[in-house]
């Protein structure tokens, strides 16, 4: 039985914070709570940003039935949000050799302490991203999952968690060698890769990583069924830029006549793909992913379904004779997160393309509960301010009457329509 973390604390409560907590199925509430005093094994943090993940929506849908949400969440509600970044506020005596007040941090929520599924953002009463302050659980500290973050660009720190999931997916791909039982991990360098349903926020991150990581394909095909989203992806990650990197990049709307499975295979010269990642839990997409695999092709089912009975057909002849295989990943590890932080802070990747909306802590409940119905990519929350959920695309119009958005519109124009460090600094200084 999974019980809420932090409930055994006996110290007096002394710091008040606003936080969004889950009480049950589709029951999220913005509340003011008190945090326990910082003890010798505690680290208290000030949270600046949190990006809302579809996994939080899934947790809201399932409530206590979710594998990370405690069974007693109705009696001991927990704070949601697990893609967060900020500044260390206070450090307990036993951790002063490792952490310092004023130091930036990012957090790897999946600590897996002693095999536990507990994680900040799901399982703890006093730690989650959709709060102003929080006390980091001892399990996170023991597993080295509170990571130093040496940057003042907080949204990058928030995006290091979703980017680590993408990086972990690439690392989890595997291939075989005739006569050997050892798997060769990672995508095929110089191989043929397809990213299906891949112009949502996670798909955009995958395009960025595929183009700029240390092991790249020679052919990259990105599919979706939405022309507008495909066009946005192509304007950010251009065919010309990919060509400069030695990669042949194609964007394909598979809903259009002639852009079917046969066409996708033709783009490979008929061999099929070495690596395919599926970003939608939709049966036709999953089956297409299997059908375009080549010899020893690896399919990663990245998209997590909420339906526990979700099934799709797979060509088992090809499994036997062509060594096709499937892997599923749902998150990265701490090293993946370190890689994400390093690549972002060094300028190798820019996951700002994932963000299409910004908002304050007051926007979290409605945004999370309606997440599947809100078009666009990542919804980025700044937890220390109040701001309605606002699309970056609406800055220009809002700026006609609001000087804040007029300036943000000017800044985003200079950054190819993307959220940026400059925009973040201006927002936090003026809101």
Enumerate the predicted regions with their spans.
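Residues in the short beta-alpha loop(s) of Rossmann-like NAD(P)-binding domains
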Residues: 225-226, 305, 385
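Rossmann-fold NAD(P)-binding glycine/threonine-rich loop
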Residues: 287, 303-323
